[in-house]
């Protein structure tokens, strides 16, 4: 057909075909299918089928031969044999001529169609190919993963095989161990029966032994009573002999003293004295209660001389004597005073001190009505100024007066120095009345010489103590021979002069001339005290005593000046009278007022004179006129002068003038020297008023200071020196100008105010002196008093209407001067007087400038805040107002209670340089002053000076920081952990919020700065509570292993709240933080940590102080293993950790779209397996096999699993819990009896908590089916939990600040930590793990700054409520572990035997002293008061060594005798804390044996009686407590080793406080042990006693009952056979080697004893 189609010849047959086709078309038009017959229809159908087949063939041909498509166009007609022709025919017949188009009109179109089709097919094929390639790669990856899974499966299978093999081995071992234990139980039961049988036999023996012991006890009691009786008799006899000895010594001393006086009297009579020898030597009282005892090491024996100012007690004479140290045995060359003075020596005076003490009690010194008589050794200060020892610079300013030219005052009345002759005590010290007749015809030079040599005779005594002399360099204890020679020479001259001074007949006495026998000046006391060579040094600490009242100008005598203190017994009585020159001196009647004396004389008329007191302190300063003052000017006035220079008659005339004497003010007086001197002033008023005779003046002036000037100058001098007596006499004169001013313009009032003499100021003001008189610089007395800080003078001047606002030439006001010198009292007084605070000086300074310039904070506070109260209620308002500025300037703001009273203009006032007070404070670095200024609201810190500098520009670094934080807002930053639930998980002690620091928000603070500050504060806080850098704990080993980080950071914060408004970290609001905080009145910033609600554990970490990584690890274990149990000691926060982990898991699952439920069940003793099954089924954790798995997450927490047996409770659930699938079902029977198969699904988590340190027995079978998390007390996280928690508690207590290392709170918290650790360490050492405590109980430790007592009380409550009961239960549980099974352990706990009670009390006492009381921060006295609050604290155990760091190693010979020798202290001998003080002396050994009550007694083995009621000793071993068990013996050993470790005492020293023990020894005991044996309280027992023997010897406390320093030990009750000595000795060596007391090993030949309990054999052998 292709050939035909391809031919180029024309087809001749087409024409007839066309004609036939046209006819057919015409027929077709008329063709009707309905009219066709059946055959036609069949033919038509066959034709159509043929055409269809032809079409199929064409399609197939076209597909096979595509080239023919391009050839079809050549053919115009087709043959009938060509199937293509049929297609052409159908085409032409089916359409009109217009629509007909050739099939292959264009080969290109056909090619394009084919190419388009091919392109589509190619794209489809490429797509399918890429998909096939991707499927191939995926398949290869799946193959690789499958291979890896296969390998892992193989490894896991191998590992499971290993675990199965190990488990099988463990099970076999456990089965074998169970068999062994069952066999041991049977053996022990048999042994128990044998022991019970032997106990019956032993009871008989112990009864006999008890009878013997009772007999020995009675004998011992009798011997003890005899010994105590003898001791009492010895004590009584010793006291009697001592009293008799004292009486004899006193009598001997009195006799020696009388002999010395008689010798001196005879010697005086031999010299032919002109005085009357008929004066009788008065007798002394025989009261020997106050006899003094001489000291041999103090040189010559001295006796005290009575003083006139001592109070009258039991004397018949009322004349007081001055205490003065005189030699009891004078040398042969002792000089004598003149015969006209006589005195007595009191034998009952205590040894006196040469010199004076400024700290004399004012009440004791002012109590006497007699005048003040100074010691002669002190008058040297009056005549010559301060001693060189006290004022070494005196020689550079004022030349010293030579001893040859300056006389000393005569003897004080009633004082005899180195002479037995009684002195004339007729009147007061400064009385002008003459008692010795001086005749007017006497030459003044002779009188002065006589006075001089009499005065110098008193300079030194035999001890080298100078009494009255100018500064001399050769007066010392090493030059006594020289002194004696000088005294002899002086007394020789005195005897020669006495002829010229004898009374002359017919010569009237000179009026106003004081006698030489009564001319004595009272010495002042320098600021640094007197120092005499060879004498005791005077105390120079306190100022002179303050007089009880101030003297006025009344005409009544005032009390005398307080006597300068000399150590004299105040209770002694002076019993000496005196007669002077036929003038009988009578004691003053008791009805007279204090300070007055009645002088009764036979010849002269009666006259009385006031007692003129001295000033208590003297300092030489420059006088206003610039001249030096004589030393005599410093003395007090004692008499009026003679009628010379036209002055008035003296005071001792017939008309007596009573002038009040005045006690100087309490402050040290600085006298001002006289201004000028002239030759005519030798008899000036000041000299005669001082008690010196005018005839002595020329001698005084030679080589001494310049003479004094006239009356006005004297007035100034008296006012400057505070000489009230002289001042009052001068003011009483007529015509004296009280307002006289010297060259500098200083008036008398100004001088008195400058030196602070308030009494002189009062006198001058009463004399109408000008109160506002100014000196040449414009300063008034008020200015001077304010500048010097003389408060009383200021009060007087203000009361006299002084000008309070007076300004000097420079503009200085009194307020300015007071602020400049920091006198706060004066400032307050001036402010109350209404002074103006704004007055400026010439330089522009105000009082505020002056206060700031000196840096005086108190002065500045007064100026700014003190509001002067109203005149009517000033005294009432003074206290509350003072509180406004008396607060600490740096911590609290004064605006809280008061507002500044000064204006802003005054605070901002600038001086000539433009500097304000703030400039001054900032430039000098006075931060406190600047802070007070900044509190004023009107301060302008930006104010500039003339150099254009602000306060910040001139400030120091500290002040710059203060200015930068001037207006900073202080906002506390808190950390919140949200709500910790539930409450029964131990969360009561967890604080929800803690203040960590205070944020400072300034105006320029941005939100970025604020965010950084918050982050930095959080980071610093987390580091502070994690690190131990600021913490000092005893146990360094614990801290070395502690992780220093808890894993928290700033990113742990979930949200931050400013007040009540949340603030996303890093976000910036429109207002600045400053404006935001002020606008919203934000009081705090709270940082909320992410918690379990967010699926995090940060808040749990902060609340519990468990590191975050640890908690995350726990959470991973729960999610991975599904079955986890937390176990540890009670109080290890197991429940809290489990519940918080469950909460975190719940919120995580809920966030993932799963529902979750937490089921908590508390297991108690009655919780059964059926109840647990119901719990699993009801919570849908255990589901039937037929039921489909649930998608709900279920978390079950079983708490307190230690209350039941794990094997019984969880035994049936172990297999389904381990294999959670339907392939491993387990059949459980319900309560109704129906059984069904159940299984645990994968969405169930089981957590349990056990308050037990370790598992025992059958519970170990459960261990392999759970993942166990052990919370050890000595490992993380429990180890560092308590330190971190308490550290955070301290930081919160101090409001975010870490306290100083010296703060006592550190010691308190460190003590609480050490108690927990030492307690657990001791309990672990005892082998009682069930008594271990977790840190939960110690989380409530109170942190009270400065009050450690609260922590000790809390510790006592914890000890009594928790620790002690647990320890008791653990000890009883262990001690009764091998008792008879029928009795039961519970019965032993309820009714413990006496031996068990003894062991428990011993253990409690050891734990209390070793773990609790050791390291307590309280002082020992306070700790002893709190010890009784602890249970077991009264047990008689040594607490000295346990409280101190180490026990005492040295013996104290008299330690025990001090408390036990007296029978009265017999009952309290056990309470004396001297158990660890061994005594090596024989007596000490004997007494120590008594005190320790046979410390070798075996406490745990001897079955002690009750510590409360029983007194008798028994060795009956109770049937309920067999100490033959291994556990009991081990417990005793551990108690022993615990006592011997560190500073603890040995357990063998524990003794029953109500029982007395006896020792038994053999005749062969060594001498070292003979002392305790010979003690009458310890009778000797028989040599051989049947011991308690056994198969196995158990080491007990007697193996260590030796004394600490190697002294032979006190023995136990029974001896040990010879065969057991070697073993006992080895035990002794082994136990002693573990002790820190370094005891030497005991010789094997010494007596060694041990307890052997199992009585199977009896051996009777004596010890060797």
From Swiss-Prot:
Start and end residues of each stretch annotated as Disordered: 1-23, 268-440, 455-479, 495-618, 871-900, 1447-1483, 1558-1664
Swiss-Prot/TrEMBL ANK repeat ranges? 710-740, 744-773, 777-806, 810-839, 843-872, 913-943
> Record's superkingdom?
Eukaryota
**Subcellular location(s) of the protein:** Cytoplasm, Cell cortex; Cell projection, Dendritic spine
Say if the entry is tagged with keyword Translocase: no
UniProt biased composition (Basic and acidic residues):
1646-1664
Compositionally biased, Low complexity: which spans? 368-379, 395-407, 1625-1639
Give the matching PROSITE patterns.
ANK_REP_REGION, ANK_REPEAT
What's this protein's function?
Answer: Regulates the dendritic spine distribution of CTTN/cortactin in hippocampal neurons, and thus controls dendritic spinogenesis and dendritic spine maintenance. Associates with the striatin-interacting phosphatase and kinase (STRIPAK) core complex to regulate dendritic spine distribution of the STRIPAK complex in hippocampal neurons.
Q: How does it assemble?
A: Interacts with CTTN/cortactin SH3 domain. Interacts with STRN, STRN4/zinedin and MOB4/phocein; this interactions mediate the association with the STRIPAK core complex and may regulate dendritic spine distribution of the STRIPAK complex in hippocampal neurons. Activation of glutamate receptors weakens the interaction with STRN and STRN4.
This protein is called what? Cortactin-binding protein 2
């Amino acid at each position: 057909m292709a050939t035909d189609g391809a031919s180029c010849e024309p087809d001749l047959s087409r024409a007839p075909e066309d004609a036939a086709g046209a006819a057919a078309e015409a027929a077709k038009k008329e063709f009707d299918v309905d009219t066709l017959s059946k055959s036609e229809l069949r033919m038509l159908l066959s034709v159509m089928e043929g055409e269809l087949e032809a079409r199929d063939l064409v399609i197939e041909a076209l597909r096979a031969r595509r080239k023919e498509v391009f050839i079809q166009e050549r053919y115009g007609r087709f043959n009938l044999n060509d199937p293509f022709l049929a297609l052409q025919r159908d085409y032409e017949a089916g359409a009109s001529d217009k629509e007909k188009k050739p099939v292959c009109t264009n080969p290109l179109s056909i090619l394009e169609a084919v190419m388009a089709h091919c392109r589509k097919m190619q794209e489809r094929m490429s797509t399918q190919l890429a998909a096939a390639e991707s499927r191939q790669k995926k398949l290869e990856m799946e193959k690789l993963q499958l291979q890896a899974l296969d390998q892992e499966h193989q490894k896991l299978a191998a590992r499971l095989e290993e675990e199965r093999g190990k488990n099988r081995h463990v099970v076999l071992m456990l089965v074998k161990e169970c068999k062994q234990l069952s066999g041991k139980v049977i053996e022990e039961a048999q042994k128990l029966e044998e022991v019970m049988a032997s106990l019956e036999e032993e009871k008989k023996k112990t009864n006999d032994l008890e009878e013997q012991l009772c007999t020995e006890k009675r004998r011992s009691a009798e011997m003890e009573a005899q010994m105590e009786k003898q001791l009492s008799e010895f004590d009584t006899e010793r006291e009697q002999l001592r009293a008799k000895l004292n009486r004899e010594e006193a009598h001997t001393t009195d006799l020696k003293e009388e002999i010395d006086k008689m010798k001196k009297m005879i010697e005086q009579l031999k010299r032919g004295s002109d005085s009357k020898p008929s004066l009788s030597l008065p007798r002394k009282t025989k009261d020997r209660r106050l006899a003094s005892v001489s000291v041999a090491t103090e040189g010559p024996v001295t006796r005290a001389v009575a003083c006139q100012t001592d109070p009258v007690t039991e004397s018949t004479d009322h004349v007081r004597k001055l205490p003065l140290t005189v030699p009891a045995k004078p040398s042969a060359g002792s000089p004598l005073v003149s015969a006209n003075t006589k005195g007595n020596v009191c034998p009952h005076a205590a040894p006196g001190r040469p010199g004076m003490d400024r700290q004399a009690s004012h009440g004791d010194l002012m109590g006497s009505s007699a005048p003040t008589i100074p010691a002669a050794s002190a008058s040297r200060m009056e005549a010559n100024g301060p001693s060189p020892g006290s004022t070494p610079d005196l020689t550079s300013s004022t030349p010293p007066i030579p001893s040859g030219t300056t006389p000393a005052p005569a003897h004080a009345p009633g004082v005899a120095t180195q002479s037995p002759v009684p002195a004339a005590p007729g009147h007061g010290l400064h009385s002008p009345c003459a008692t010795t007749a001086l005749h007017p015809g006497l030459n003044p030079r002779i009188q002065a010489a006589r006075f001089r040599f009499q005065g110098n005779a008193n300079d030194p005594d035999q001890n080298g103590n100078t009494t009255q002399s100018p500064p001399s360099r050769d007066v010392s204890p090493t030059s006594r021979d020289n002194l004696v020679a000088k005294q002899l020479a002086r007394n020789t001259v005195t005897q020669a002069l006495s002829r010229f001074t004898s009374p002359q007949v017919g010569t009237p006495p000179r009026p106003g001339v004081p006698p030489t026998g009564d001319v004595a000046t009272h010495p002042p006391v320098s600021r640094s005290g007197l120092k005499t060579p060879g004498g005791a040094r005077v105390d120079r600490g306190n100022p002179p005593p303050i007089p009880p009242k101030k003297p006025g100008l009344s005409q009544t005598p005032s009390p005398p000046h307080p006597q300068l203190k000399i150590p004299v017994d105040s209770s002694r009585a002076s019993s000496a009278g005196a007669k002077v020159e036929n003038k009988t001196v009578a004691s003053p009647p008791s009805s007279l007022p204090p300070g007055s004396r009645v002088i009764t004389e036979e010849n002269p008329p009666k006259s009385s004179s006031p007692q003129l007191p001295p000033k208590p302190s003297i300092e030489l300063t420059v006088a206003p006129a610039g001249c030096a003052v004589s030393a005599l000017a410093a003395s007090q006035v004692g008499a009026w002068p003679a009628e010379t220079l036209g002055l008035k008659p003296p005071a001792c005339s017939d008309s007596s003038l009573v002038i009040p004497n005045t006690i100087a003010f309490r402050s040290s007086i600085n006298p001002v020297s006289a201004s000028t001197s002239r030759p005519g002033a030798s008899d000036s008023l000041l000299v005669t008023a001082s008690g010196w005779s005018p005839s002595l003046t020329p001698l005084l002036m030679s080589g001494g200071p310049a003479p004094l000037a006239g009356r006005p100058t004297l007035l100034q001098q008296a006012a400057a020196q505070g000489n009230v007596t002289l001042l009052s006499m001068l003011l009483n004169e007529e015509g004296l100008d009280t307002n006289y001013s010297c060259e500098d313009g200083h008036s008398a009032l100004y001088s008195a105010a400058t030196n602070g003499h308030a009494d002189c100021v009062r006198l001058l003001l009463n004399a109408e002196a000008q109160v506002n008189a100014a000196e040449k610089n414009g300063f008034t007395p008020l200015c001077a008093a304010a500048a010097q800080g003389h408060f009383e003078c200021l009060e007087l001047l203000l009361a006299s209407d002084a000008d309070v606002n007076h300004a000097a030439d420079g503009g200085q006001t009194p307020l300015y001067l007071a602020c400049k010198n920091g006198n706060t009292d004066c400032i307050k007084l001036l402010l109350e007087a209404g002074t103006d605070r704004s007055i400026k000086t010439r330089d522009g300074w105000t009082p505020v400038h002056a206060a700031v310039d000196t840096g005086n904070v108190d002065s500045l506070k007064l100026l700014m805040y003190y509001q002067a109260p109203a005149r009517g209620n000033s005294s009432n308002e003074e206290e509350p107002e003072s509180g406004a500025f008396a607060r600490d300037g740096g911590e609290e703001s004064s605006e809280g209670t008061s507002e500044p009273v000064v204006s802003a203009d005054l605070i901002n006032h600038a001086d000539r340089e433009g500097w304000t007070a703030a400039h001054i404070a900032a430039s000098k670095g006075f931060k406190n002053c600047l802070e007070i200024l900044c509190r004023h609201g009107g301060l302008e810190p930006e104010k500039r000076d003339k150099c254009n500098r602000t306060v910040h520009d001139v400030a120091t670094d500290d002040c710059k920081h203060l200015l930068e934080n001037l207006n900073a807002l202080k906002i506390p930053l808190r950390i919140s952990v949200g709500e910790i639930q539930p409450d029964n998980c131990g969360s009561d002690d967890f604080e929800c919020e803690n203040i960590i620091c205070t944020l400072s928000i300034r105006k320029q603070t941005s939100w970025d700065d604020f965010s950084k500050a918050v982050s930095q504060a959080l980071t610093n806080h987390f580091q502070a509570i994690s690190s131990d850098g600021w913490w000092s704990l005893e146990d360094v080993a614990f801290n070395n292993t502690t992780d220093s980080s808890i894993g928290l950071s700033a990113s742990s914060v979930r949200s931050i709240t400013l007040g009540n408004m949340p603030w996303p970290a890093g976000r910036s609001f429109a207002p600045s933080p400053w404006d935001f905080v002020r606008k919203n009145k934000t009081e705090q910033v709270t940082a909320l940590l992410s918690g379990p609600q967010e699926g995090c554990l940060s808040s749990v970490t902060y609340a519990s102080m468990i590191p975050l990584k640890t908690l995350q690890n726990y959470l991973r274990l729960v999610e991975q293993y599904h079955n986890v149990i937390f176990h540890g000691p009670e109080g290890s926060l197991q429940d809290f950790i489990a519940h918080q982990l469950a909460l975190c898991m719940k919120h995580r699952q809920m966030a993932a779209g799963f529902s979750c439920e937490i089921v908590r069940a508390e297991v108690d003793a009655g919780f059964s397996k059926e109840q647990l099954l119901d719990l699993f089924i009801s919570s849908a954790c255990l589901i039937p096999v037929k039921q489909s798995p649930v998608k709900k997450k279920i978390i079950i927490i079983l708490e307190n699993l230690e209350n039941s047996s794990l094997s019984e409770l969880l035994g049936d659930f172990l297999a389904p819990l381990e294999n959670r699938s339907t392939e491993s079902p387990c059949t459980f029977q319900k309560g109704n009896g129906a059984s069904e198969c159940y299984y645990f699904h994968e969405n169930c988590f089981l957590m349990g908590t056990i308050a037990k340190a370790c598992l025992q027995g059958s519970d170990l079978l459960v261990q392999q089916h759970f993942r166990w998390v052990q919370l050890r007390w000595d490992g993380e996280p429990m180890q560092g939990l308590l330190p971190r928690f308490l550290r955070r508690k301290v930081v919160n207590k101090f409001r975010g600040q870490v306290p100083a290392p010296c703060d006592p709170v550190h010691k308190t918290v460190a003590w609480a930590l050490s108690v927990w650790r030492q307690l657990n360490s001791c309990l672990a050492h005892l082998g009682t793990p069930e008594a271990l405590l977790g840190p939960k109980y110690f989380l409530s430790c109170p942190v009270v700054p400065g009050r450690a007592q609260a922590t000790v009380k809390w510790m006592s409550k914890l000890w009594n409520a928790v620790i002690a009961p647990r320890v008791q239960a653990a000890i009883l549980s262990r001690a009764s572990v091998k008792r008879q099974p029928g009795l039961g352990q519970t019965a032993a706990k309820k009714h413990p035997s006496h031996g068990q009670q003894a062991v428990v009390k011993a253990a409690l006492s050891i734990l209390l002293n070793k773990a609790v009381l050791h390291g307590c921060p309280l002082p020992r006295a306070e700790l002893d008061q709190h010890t009784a609050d602890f249970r077991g604290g009264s047990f008689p155990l040594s607490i000295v060594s346990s409280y101190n760091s180490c026990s005492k190693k040295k013996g104290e010979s008299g330690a025990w005798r001090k408390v036990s020798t007296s029978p009265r202290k017999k009952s309290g001998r056990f309470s004396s804390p001297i158990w660890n003080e061994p005594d090596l002396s024989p007596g000490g050994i004997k007494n120590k044996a008594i005190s320790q009550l046979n410390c070798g007694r075996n406490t745990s083995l001897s079955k002690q009686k009750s510590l409360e009621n029983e007194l008798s000793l028994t060795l009956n071993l109770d049937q309920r407590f067999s100490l033959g068990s291994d556990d009991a013996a081990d417990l005793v050993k551990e108690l022993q080793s615990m006592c011997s470790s560190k500073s603890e005492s040995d357990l063998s020293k524990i003794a029953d406080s109500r029982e007395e023990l006896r020792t038994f020894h053999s005749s062969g005991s060594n001498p070292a042990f003979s002392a305790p044996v010979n003690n009458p309280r310890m009778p000797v027992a028989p040599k051989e006693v049947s011991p308690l023997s056994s198969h196995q010897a158990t080491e007990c406390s007697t193996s260590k009952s030796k004394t600490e320093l190697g002294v032979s030990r006190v023995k136990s009750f029974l001896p040990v056979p010879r065969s057991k000595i070697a073993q006992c000795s080895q035990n002794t060596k082994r136990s002693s080697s573990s002790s820190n007391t370094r005891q030497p090993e005991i010789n094997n030949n010494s007596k060694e004893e041990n307890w052997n309990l199992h009585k199977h054999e009896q051996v009777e052998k004596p010890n060797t």
